[in-house]
């Protein structure tokens, strides 16, 4: 009705037999609060709660024999730290619940868990999240920007690791990602010294 404006709404009310002035209609229209841009609201939510937000997601990795493996991970928003990851051939809701149980054995400092509309995140998974004190928060459909921290980590993992090495199997992929996560946790000063030593050699 906002697109019609006061004159049109006034005309419709007259047709229905309501005798009100156009000025009264305009006055009440101005009182309707306008909702902000969805992107702005979501950004504000992420900024206000970043220390209490964790996100989980899947990404697929083909192996040397063209099998598809699914890598599940949980990432902390504030420090962009991987809290947990695991690899499987067939992810199921029960498997995801077990992964979350490994990460969140009890009440923790986190309040919100972001995840997309993957069918694996069903009622059992969201029920477990609620039981551990997490508020399950689904992102919009086809809106990867709403879980940008997780999507960025996947992109970095592909670019810096998986685009250069082909995983042989499930165990090999787990070992590769474990080494990559350990590398990311290495202090920057140590990484720089390693680079300098490599340049000297």
Where are these regions (language model features)?
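Charged DNA-binding/catalytic regions of mobile-element recombinases
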Residues: 1-201
